[in-house]
Amino acid sequence: MRVSTRVLAVLLLPVAFLRAPGRARHLACQWALGLRYPAENLDGLDPRARRAFEEARTDAFWQDGQLIGLTSGHRDAAEQHRMFAEQVRRTGSWAAARRWVLPPEESSHVRGIAMDVRPTQGAYWLELHGGRYDLYRTYDNEWWHFEYRPETDGRPPLRMPHPGAEPYHSASRW
């Protein structure tokens, strides 16, 4: 599927060039990935986070032949609450649920800066190269979860064991 998506993007390049000469590779990549991952929705992402994600996956696609799709991006508070309530029901406790899903008031998805990506190879590429775009994996237990974090000045934020873990407070970073 990766090869056919790449071939499709190459075929779309002339049309993309006519539409946006300076951004043809970006546009052709987004079109091809949109066909490859038709259910993905980038709406609601913080505009800077969306731009960073699109730039990262365009570079991954053209430079390394790697596909990066979005499984979940922005969620409204009601959807996040539904997911959290379901996880509480499934795990039996609020604390156990927080290991996988946060309530809306704490969720980076609700703020529009979190992206759950696929496939695993795409997540691996993003883990290796995402810092160039201020995109970082933030939880040990979620290989797919990345956040747009420009405030870290190019340094990876401290990765937490899981979403509900208490942040480690220290005067210095390791």
Task: Walk through the language-model features, giving the residues of each.
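Cell-envelope/glycan interface and biosynthesis
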Residues: 2-174
